[in-house]
């Protein structure tokens, strides 16, 4: 049973949220009721620049943080964290919306999972090829490894001179604690169905045969990374492989090598897209929007589960213990 204080806290928070949301609803452009309640799409469109040509808009989508599908949904406490499923939905909606003339991806990431990067890349490629909408990338402080992978199929790529990009390659890591365990007198008993069932186990060294197996996986994903750049940037495979040794590049260096089209910030990207479209459209930003359903769902979880945060931390730790292939730049 929840205590009286918890019920009062929930009611007070709900009243505050409803009042704040009502003010926001009145002062904002018209918004779909389903979206506001939280039963429809999970984003809102905010006008950031008003144009003189009406009818269509340019959409800005922000990708910030490690590209990883943590499985958690956005909440009041983690709206600043990257949410993979939510970003894919936003990208899909922007691609399908006939009122969106072009898309700008604001990218600031060291990369992340191979699968997650491939999912974003696929959607960007489909928008450019099937919808015939221009997709421009505006790189921030960092757009490395998976950050470059998802940018490769874009119509144009912009970066600041100081942007860190590149890091083209694949990495897979694990920790070997067998030596430490031996010093501490700890023994591990493993029963397995095949010789490679516990490959990359932390409790023993990797064998030569296992190194060969793992390297073939890394090489396969690396070849895919190279292909993505060849197709997206119109470069030869030889050119790409010379650049794709894992090193990082500044934005200026990336322009010189052909990995990036032009230097410039977000304002430059917006201006360039307007010129290429031949229209001064409104510029809108897609942002996650917490509706009433999201709020009450999150609040209920927190109140009914005292260990809610601990469960999230435990899930994250369990994920980090599992070696995965990554397009990730690790500083």
Swiss-Prot record:
Q: Which UniProt keywords apply?
A: Cell membrane, Hydrolase, Membrane, Protease, Serine protease, Transmembrane, Transmembrane helix
Q: Which residues cross the membrane?
A: 7-27
Topological type in the membrane: Single-pass membrane protein
Q: Name one GO molecular function term.
A: serine-type peptidase activity
What sort of enzyme, by top EC class, is this? hydrolase
GO cellular component labels: plasma membrane
- NCBIfam families (alphabetical): SppA_dom
In terms of PANTHER family, this protein maps to: PEPTIDASE S49, SIGNAL PEPTIDE PEPTIDASE SPPA-RELATED
Its biological purpose is as follows: Digestion of the cleaved signal peptides.
Assembly state and interactors? Homooctamer, assembles into a ring structure with a central cavity.
**Member of which family?**
Belongs to the peptidase S49 family.
Name assigned to this protein: Putative signal peptide peptidase SppA
Which organism does this sequence originate in? Halalkalibacterium halodurans (strain ATCC BAA-125 / DSM 18197 / FERM 7344 / JCM 9153 / C-125)
Q: Which gene encodes it?
A: sppA
